[in-house]
């Protein structure tokens, strides 16, 4: 089922949102990743690589670099790890990513309409 080794943009949004929800509802990081793997929601190879990084003592932010989150998002995660409220930060990142996606879609609609009229 999972052939790609990278998550799509939508999968990254869903992943960070669901992880934030699980953490907010009392799951530990280990429990959340076990849930993701058992439910087969995301590519197991990616999740296992992140899990392995965490077991080796790497920070969550450093582990997320392989998931292609932006440097700004990784910085937010790093600060949340240091100062607390990781769950809320992850939910905020998901909302920000959704907003950017909506703006991108609206921009493409606005640009494509005049081009359609010219053709």
Predicted regions and their residues:
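Catalytic metal-binding core of the metallo-beta-lactamase
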Residues: 1-116
